[in-house]
Amino acid sequence: MIGKLTGTLLEKNPPEVLVDCGGVGYEVQVPMSTFYNLPASGAKVSLLTHFVVREDAQLLYGFGTHSERQAFRELIKITGIGPRMALSVLSGMSVEDLAQAVTLQEVGRLVKVPGIGKKTAERLLLELKGKIGADTGAQSLFVNNDQNDIVQALMALGYSDKDAAAALKKLPPDVGVTEGIKLALKALAK
């Protein structure tokens, strides 16, 4: 219903901010990653929002980027993950880190987030696989096009994205595509 707010930032009390839009003050919950990038009070601010209506409350959640809002929306679709927990996840790690954790299926990174236990982390990884890591993490996980080409080649050969990314970690950072594929195949053969 409310997709974006643009106005004057009146107050900053983590994780909540107050934004004045044409004389109406909106209380908006934001992840810490967005909070740290906000301007000083009194400055103009623009936030992408997600509006949640519950029986006892109507809440606005704000985000600095489209990828943050999309990650939030994917997180709240998961059983047992509400808006507060999703905000906690996005406050505990960047969208890129979350996408990388999903791509590499790293439970350990998610359990570091307050309120996320091992079972919840495993459920998150299972349900987010293919939704968040595919478009967000693939871009941030690979530093350059050569690395991306190496991973794509390995996946075309039938290796999973997790195996391909693990093999990529073992390669020198400046390796070319041809040599990188050869070295990655040797690493995967072991």
Curated annotation (Swiss-Prot):
Its job: The RuvA-RuvB-RuvC complex processes Holliday junction (HJ) DNA during genetic recombination and DNA repair, while the RuvA-RuvB complex plays an important role in the rescue of blocked DNA replication forks via replication fork reversal (RFR). RuvA specifically binds to HJ cruciform DNA, conferring on it an open structure. The RuvB hexamer acts as an ATP-dependent pump, pulling dsDNA into and through the RuvAB complex. HJ branch migration allows RuvC to scan DNA until it finds its consensus sequence, where it cleaves and resolves the cruciform DNA.
A Pfam family recorded for this sequence: RuvA_N
Record-level GO BP terms: DNA recombination; DNA repair
Name of the molecule in the record: Holliday junction branch migration complex subunit RuvA
Region (Flexible linker): 144-148
Family: Belongs to the RuvA family.
Record GO terms (molecular function): ATP binding; four-way junction DNA binding; four-way junction helicase activity
Superkingdom as given in the UniProt entry: Bacteria
Region of interest (Domain II), ranges: 65-143
Domain comment in the entry: Has three domains with a flexible linker between the domains II and III and assumes an 'L' shape. Domain III is highly mobile and contacts RuvB.
Keywords from the named record: Cytoplasm, DNA damage, DNA recombination, DNA repair, DNA-binding
Chain residue ranges for the region called Domain III: 148-190
SUPFAM superfamilies: DNA helicase RuvA subunit, C-terminal domain, Nucleic acid-binding proteins, RuvA domain 2-like
Gene: ruvA
Gene Ontology cellular-component annotations: cytoplasm; Holliday junction helicase complex; Holliday junction resolvase complex
Segments for region (Domain I): 1-64
NCBIfam families: ruvA
Compartments where found: Cytoplasm
Subunit: Homotetramer. Forms an RuvA(8)-RuvB(12)-Holliday junction (HJ) complex. HJ DNA is sandwiched between 2 RuvA tetramers; dsDNA enters through RuvA and exits via RuvB. An RuvB hexamer assembles on each DNA strand where it exits the tetramer. Each RuvB hexamer is contacted by two RuvA subunits (via domain III) on 2 adjacent RuvB subunits; this complex drives branch migration. In the full resolvosome a probable DNA-RuvA(4)-RuvB(12)-RuvC(2) complex forms which resolves the HJ.
